[in-house]
């Protein structure tokens, strides 16, 4: 059983220096090539119902957008396709995934992580942690490769260490991209290949790993609705237990992203106030302020690192 769970989202890669935002991807040569090929694949009268046109329109409205959120909107609002359109959309969706994989492989090829970044420093220090730990990746990249760190189950400082890639990885050349069925929605069977659960093919025990951990760290993950199924039991238990046995640290960019995360948690029926009442500690660390040498944020960061390196401490 891992006593420490580190949950990593795309913000972790961004902190490390990778241009891995979806808005970066849609400006890439890989996406432009995908876009051109998809336009040629459809008849003119079919293009209006295509996924590529939906993504184009969404990006035109905002330079920042989430492809998976747009896929969800597309699945919810588009039905009644004939067999030909379903085949074309399936092909289009598969080509989108290939384009994303090719883009991420290109930008990670020979990438050197900035060792002064918090993300990099955290992974190095985690190897000195005396607690059994699990790293849970919601992104597709393998930062351990940039840092020349092991990728499989290992023993560090006498403690076991596990790695889980929830949505696949570039190393496996297989990624999970799409959306999940939200509460109250009906399955769109014509486009069900876009649901993430239909792309999963092995158990990962993520929910149990987080629930069992006593030290939980989110870095660069928005704790959004799409992924909340993995966190729900943990947050329910953490907000309800009168025995404060857990430390929760959420590392995010700034105050606005902190508010968004709190709103996301509250929207899932979890009281943020109860989390503050029932966790041993709940801290938000803003990377922007740490880099700006803010004394309060630096103190919170140093307290976290010290706790990671200490075997006997409160709450564990």
Residues covered by each model-derived region:
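Acidic, metal/cofactor-coordinating or nucleic-acid-engaging core segments within structured domains
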Residues: 39-52, 174-213, 226, 262, ...
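Surface-exposed cleft-lining segments at the edges of enzyme active sites
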Residues: 103-115, 187-197, 221
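Generic preference for well-ordered secondary structure
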Residues: 6-9, 127-128, 190-200, 215-218
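SIR2/sirtuin-family catalytic core signature
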Residues: 1-16, 152-153, 205-316
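Active-site periphery "cap/insert" segments of enzyme catalytic domains
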Residues: 2-7, 16-168, 207-212, 225, ...
